């Protein structure tokens, strides 16, 4: 969150289940707008749906994964720059592949996302590809002298241990706050 908060207006957490478990984060928590834990695409779709429901004067929503501690600090800036060449859905790419949960989503795509979910689509990458998403390349980042994929994902205890080993004690404490 600390990597994205200076670059966006409001931060909102998408999570299903009891929202009070995230109270210490001080964020609004929204659940998927479709039932039955319909996968990552439902989480992505929750953002544009929230903006449309609130009738906010926004054209795009940025989504990031909460378990990716090294994502680039210039992510939003570079996504916005990509819009200048082609105003559409923008997603991240690195040497490890496409990372479509990291995206800049046009609010106008909310009905199409909802339709895709109702038709059984669950994969963010497959849907983004169908939409002709623009991919923005991000090179490896240096973390304590080691080059790592900027979208390194903490998907288990061993990944968490690896991420903690890469962080300085100061950065680790800042991330815990």
Name every feature range the model reports, one short phrase each:
Residues 1-150, 161-175:
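Nucleotide and nucleotide-moiety/phosphate-recognizing core
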Residues 158:
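Conserved active-site and cofactor/substrate-binding residues in soluble primary-metabolism enzymes
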Residues 155:
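Active-site rim beta-loop-alpha module in soluble metabolic enzymes
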């Amino acid at each position: 969150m600390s990597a994205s908060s200076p670059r966006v207006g409001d931060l909102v957490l998408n999570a299903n289940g009891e929202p009070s478990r995230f109270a210490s984060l001080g964020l609004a928590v929204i659940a998927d707008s479709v039932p039955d834990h319909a996968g990552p695409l439902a989480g992505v779709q929750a953002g544009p749906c929230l903006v449309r429901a609130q009738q906010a004067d926004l054209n795009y929503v940025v989504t990031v994964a909460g378990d990716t501690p090294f994502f680039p600090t210039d992510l939003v800036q570079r996504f916005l720059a990509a819009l200048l060449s082609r105003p559409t859905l923008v997603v991240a790419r690195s040497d490890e592949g496409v990372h479509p949960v990291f995206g800049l989503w046009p609010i106008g795509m909310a009905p199409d996302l909802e339709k895709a979910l109702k038709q059984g689509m669950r994969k963010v990458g497959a849907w983004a590809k169908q939409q002709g998403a623009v991919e923005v390349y991000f090179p490896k980042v240096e973390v304590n002298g080691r080059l790592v994929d900027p979208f390194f994902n903490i998907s288990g205890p061993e990944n968490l241990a690896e991420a903690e080993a890469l962080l300085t004690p100061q950065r680790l404490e800042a991330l815990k706050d």
